[in-house]
From Swiss-Prot:
Catalysed reactions listed for this entry: guanosine(46) in tRNA + S-adenosyl-L-methionine = N(7)-methylguanosine(46) in tRNA + S-adenosyl-L-homocysteine
A molecular-function term among this protein's GO annotations: tRNA (guanine(46)-N7)-methyltransferase activity
Gene that this polypeptide is encoded by: trmB
Protein name per Swiss-Prot or TrEMBL: tRNA (guanine-N(7)-)-methyltransferase
Any one Pfam family match given in the protein's UniProt record, by short name: Methyltransf_4
Keyword S-adenosyl-L-methionine: yes
SUPFAM superfamilies in the record: S-adenosyl-L-methionine-dependent methyltransferases
HAMAP family in the cross-refs: tRNA_methyltr_TrmB
Pathway linked to the protein: tRNA modification; N(7)-methylguanine-tRNA biosynthesis
Annotated CDD domains: AdoMet_MTases
Amino acid sequence: MSDVTTAEFNEEGKYLRKVRSFVLREGRLTKGQAAAMEQHWPAMGLDYSPEPLDLKEVFGRDADTVLEIGFGMGASLVEMAKASPELNFIGIEVHKPGVGACLSVAGEAGVTNLRVFHHDAIEVLENSIVKGSLARVQLFFPDPWHKKRHHKRRIVQSEFAQLIRNTLKIGGVFHLATDWENYSEHMLEVMGAAEGYKNQSLTGDVVERPDHRPLTKFEARGHRLGHGVWDIMFERID
């Protein structure tokens, strides 16, 4: 689980920039992570720029692109990239050891269709991603901010939903997953009210975990203990 930002939102879901949590909790890299950063960042790292990325130039090809917000240590993101070599993958993570771990695993796996940002997701989405360019955006297990007084810090808010919508192609999908039922209800409420989206669930709520999202060790342990995980997928229709 990883924080992307501690930004708060007002009652209308308006994004308000705040001091970001990763400045306070930046951890030290292990020797392996530091070595992976040095070895693999030149090929897989994306330096933040307020200018939109040319995805064809970045990946050297035209292909559908999947972006994941807050990939943690990156194991599942690398697994997805390896399983779908026909797709391009971009990951965003503010926790530097996570970026180093992801690059280490990606290097060992030999994936060539993955690029990563070590930066704030909101700024990347606002400035670095061409509008209407993504086939899928993934937000898996964001901080649930489970105390009610902290709900306004949850990243899934109305303005955020529209920010994601702007990056998606028509027909592109915003895929969310959480292991907090209350947050899944919040996600469904926000996304259900968001303009330009359609829930892919035939029952209007959650979907079964799709094959493209790997089962994490944490999630598998939760299943054994009877804990739930909720997958939510909304398609951009307008």
